[in-house]
């Protein structure tokens, strides 16, 4: 049974989830969904580790959405997990990131199950939206 705080948080993050879904991202909300996706997907995947923090709202989510609209080459798949909300799904996805330390928000470009490009929170916080979009576009150009 959930408490009032958990219910409040579930309601509060709905727009934060929808922002990426509207941009074409599939939400993976359970450990099983992550495993199913990762074990049965080929090609390239952009994974956004979503977060409630300000840099996710002002930089990460809008940059990811714009990058997939603007880029000539794009990943085959777009998925997102929500750190702090869908804890099991996020932990499972991070297992596929290998030795890369947990970071949220963050973005990972995978070829199959291999991380070929990663943007950490500290790289998001210190950048402009255009810099993040360019970073992603260059990664897409090289890997997709």
From Swiss-Prot:
Domain of life: Bacteria
A GO biological-process term: cell redox homeostasis
Pfam families on file: Disulph_isomer
InterPro entries: BrxB/BrxA (IPR009474)
Family: Belongs to the bacilliredoxin family.
Listed PANTHER family: BACILLIREDOXIN BRXA (PTHR40052:SF2), UPF0403 PROTEIN YQIW-RELATED (PTHR40052)
Protein name per its UniProtKB record: Bacilliredoxin BA_2173/GBAA_2173/BAS2019
Source organism (scientific name): Bacillus anthracis
